[in-house]
Amino acid sequence: MKKGTVLNSEISSVISRLGHTDTLVVCDAGLPIPNSTARIDIALTQGVPSFMQVVDVVTREMQVEAAILATEIKQQNPQLHETLLTHLEQLQQHQGNTIKISYTTHEQFKKLTADSQAVIRSGECSPYANVILCAGVTF
């Protein structure tokens, strides 16, 4: 049995295959996922697992160099926005790099998900709880 951080075989596999600048999406239960993009659905019920639980576990194994959020999160979900920014700041310190944070409209965000390696669907049921994580390198 694997004893690393990520036990979910699909998530572990997609992280191990990421190359520099590849993207991985963690989303809430409501984000539409393009048919052309791999869907890793781990939602069990409303709120389980939460968006931040998934982000926390994924970023323990994934080297992140950038994150893209929908601009709407600032007004529509400020508490989660602040929690995510704090997490990314702590991740920067742990990784020893700067994580570039950028914003786009929710409509554009949905289009960008089509280019990601996979979308991990959480059970989160709060607005705009979505992030595109861009893979960095460990060297």
Curated annotation (Swiss-Prot):
GO terms for biological process: D-ribose catabolic process. Pathway: Carbohydrate metabolism; D-ribose degradation; D-ribose 5-phosphate from beta-D-ribopyranose: step 1/2. It is an enzyme of class 5 (isomerase). Keywords: Carbohydrate metabolism, Cytoplasm, Isomerase. It holds the Pfam family RbsD_FucU. Gene3D superfamilies: RbsD-like domain. GO terms for cellular component: cytosol. Its EC number is 5.4.99.62. The active site is at H20 (proton donor). It catalyses: beta-D-ribopyranose = beta-D-ribofuranose. Substrate binds at D28, H106, Y128, A129, N130. Its main location: cytoplasm. It is found in: Cytoplasm. GO terms for molecular function: D-ribose pyranase activity; intramolecular lyase activity; monosaccharide binding. Belongs to the RbsD / FucU family. RbsD subfamily. Homodecamer. Catalyzes the interconversion of beta-pyran and beta-furan forms of D-ribose. This is D-ribose pyranase. It comes from Salmonella agona (strain SL483). The lineage of its organism: Bacteria, Pseudomonadati, Pseudomonadota, Gammaproteobacteria, Enterobacterales.
